[in-house]
Each structure stands twice: as structure tokens, then as C-alpha cells.
């Protein structure tokens, strides 16, 4: 049974994936391109969500390559694809991968949610060919400074609701600080040539980025009430996210690339 808090059955999922893809795909594509990604590569996109990065990988590797997009619940990836890009309903924690020897394995904002993340990391490393690249991209959920607010109480309200959201995530086994631990975890897993780049931007009320916060808070509204957030606070939080006088730092995405040593068999 999944413990993933924002499961993909929620009607808010489409908006969540839209915000994630619009805000972070250009950055993620740059990180993936830096691995040497080329026609003919075999790639694994784990927890592919809306599938946009898996589709982009498919364009880069061309018909001579192969991309497998997995997800616990891939309902948001259902659309026509070329035959070399396939979608698999798959639990990365409990089900064996159909194959290994990948040139590139990528997962964005997946291991953060999985309590067994270190065991999953070992499986992802084992799925690489010697010399293959792993790219993990994760949030540090704790660094979200408010950059501008319409009044004195708004920053405190934002921080209160976000803290409740993070508390709900942690109760489901998420590690909200995972982003800052990924580099060391990948080194411990035996990867070399490690490099990290972090991306953040400002998100203004009413914009695409804060759509992520709208979607998340709406999907877990009941859990937020359990954390003591009142109906009135929740209503004011959503109004704040719609206010162009409010600007907050985006969640910082820490992208780490490493390679399986070439000498390994
Ligand atoms: C926050 S979303 C990120 C989606 C996408 N990677 C992105 O960054 O746009 C997390 C995704 O991981 C998937 N997921 C969660 N647990 C998983 C598991 N055990 N195995 C495979 N996918 C999982 C969820 O279904 C969801 O689609």
C-alpha cells in the first residue's frame, strides 16, 4: 500500500504536475543534457508523474534509443508516444526492474517521499551500466523565504501552513531535508564524478509556481486541519497565493549527478 501523501488519484494532481513541469523542466533538461545524453541511449525515468521529462528524453535518444517511464500510478502519462518510449506501472520500492544496464537513470521528487529511499538508491545504481549516470533531483523543503508580502501577518500565515504541510509529509515517511542529503548518499552508494546544482526562483501570487502550493494544500486540507490550521487560515492562505503583492522563494531543487565507476562489472 502506498504511503505517498499526494497520490495521483487527487483531482489536484494535474495542476501539481503542470506547475512542476513549467517551473523545473527547463532546469532538469539542462542537468540531463550535461550527462552526455545522446541518440541511442537507454534511459529510465522513475516516478515520471506527468511524463514530460520522459517524453523529452525520448526525443533526445531517438528511435534507436529507449526510454522507460515508471510510476506507481501512471494515469497522468496516458497519451500517444513513439514505440521507443514506454510507460510502466511500477513500484520502485517493491517490484524488480524489468531490465538493467541503463545509460541514464533519472528521478525527480520521488525518493523524498519514500521511506526506503536509501535501498531504492542502491537499486537505481545497480540498474546503471558501468559508466552510466544517475541524476537525482530533490527539494530542500525547509528553505522557502517570503520575499514580499501585502501585510505584516502574511509571512507568518504562509510559514504556518507550510509547516503543517511538511508535518503531514513527514508523517507519511517523507524526508523534507532529503535534497541536502542526496550528494552524500550518492557518494556512499559508490557513485563518482559527483556534481550538484541548485535551482530556485521567485514565485508571485497568482502565478504558475504557487499553483503547486494551491494543489498540495487543497489535496491534504483535512491533514492540515489535523495539524491545527483553521478553515479561516486556509482560506486566507489560498487568497494570499492569489495576491500579486505576495512573492515567495520557490522550493529549491537540488540536482545531483553521479556516475557508476566504469571499471565495475
Ligand atoms: C511529486 S511527484 C513528481 C513527479 C515527476 N517526477 C516530476 O518531478 O514532475 C512524485 C511521483 O512519484 C511517484 N511515486 C511515488 N512513490 C513511488 C514508488 N514507490 N514507485 C514509483 N513511483 C512512485 C508518484 O506517483 C508521483 O507521480
Segments (PLM) and residue ranges:
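A short SAM/SAH-binding and catalytic strip from SAM-dependent methyltransferases
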Residues: 103-118
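Conserved alpha-helix/loop element of class I SAM-dependent methyltransferases that forms part
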Residues: 22-41, 56
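Class I SAM-dependent methyltransferase Rossmann-like catalytic core
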Residues: 2-25
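Conserved catalytic/acceptor-binding region of the Class I
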Residues: 135-207
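A short acidic, Gly/Pro-enriched loop at the edge of an enzyme's catalytic core
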Residues: 95-105
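Class I SAM-dependent methyltransferase SAM/SAH-binding core
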Residues: 44-95
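Conserved Class I S-adenosyl-L-methionine
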Residues: 175-177, 187, 192-265
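A short glycine-rich, Lys/Arg-flanked "PGG" loop and its adjoining helix->strand segment in the class I
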Residues: 118-133
Amino acid at each position: 500500500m502506498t504511503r505517498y501523501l499526494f497520490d495521483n488519484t487527487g483531482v489536484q494532481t494535474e495542476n501539481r504536475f503542470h506547475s512542476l513541469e513549467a517551473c523545473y523542466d527547463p532546469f532538469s533538461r539542462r542537468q540531463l543534457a550535461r550527462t552526455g545524453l545522446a541518440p541511442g541511449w537507454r534511459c529510465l525515468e522513475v516516478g515520471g508523474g506527468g511524463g514530460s521529462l520522459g517524453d523529452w528524453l525520448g526525443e533526445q535518444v531517438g528511435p534507436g534509443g529507449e526510454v522507460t517511464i515508471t510510476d506507481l500510478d501512471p494515469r497522468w502519462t496516458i497519451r500517444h508516444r513513439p514505440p521507443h518510449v514506454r510507460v510502466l506501472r511500477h513500484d520502485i520500492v517493491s517490484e524488480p526492474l524489468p531490465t538493467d544496464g541503463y545509460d541514464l537513470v533519472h528521478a525527480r521528487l520521488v525518493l523524498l517521499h519514500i521511506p526506503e529511499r536509501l535501498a531504492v538508491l542502491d537499486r537505481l545504481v545497480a540498474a546503471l551500466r558501468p559508466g552510466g549516470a544517475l541524476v537525482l533531483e530533490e527539494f530542500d523543503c525547509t528553505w522557502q523565504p517570503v520575499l514580499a508580502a501585502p501585510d505584516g501577518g502574511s509571512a507568518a500565515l504562509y510559514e504556518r501552513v507550510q509547516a503543517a504541510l511538511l508535518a503531514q509529509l513527514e508523517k507519511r515517511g517523507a524526508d523534507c531535508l532529503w535534497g541536502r542529503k542526496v550528494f552524500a548518499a550518492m557518494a556512499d552508494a559508490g557513485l563518482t564524478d559527483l556534481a550538484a546544482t541548485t535551482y530556485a526562483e521567485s514565485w508571485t501570487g497568482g502565478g504558475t509556481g504557487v499553483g503547486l502550493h494551491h494543489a498540495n494544500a487543497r489535496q491534504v486540507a483535512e491533514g492540515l486541519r489535523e495539524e491545527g490550521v483553521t478553515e479561516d487560515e486556509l482560506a486566507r492562505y489560498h487568497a494570499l497565493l492569489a495576491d500579486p503583492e505576495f512573492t515567495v522563494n520557490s522550493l529549491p531543487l537540488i540536482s545531483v549527478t553521479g556516475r557508476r565507476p566504469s571499471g565495475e562489472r
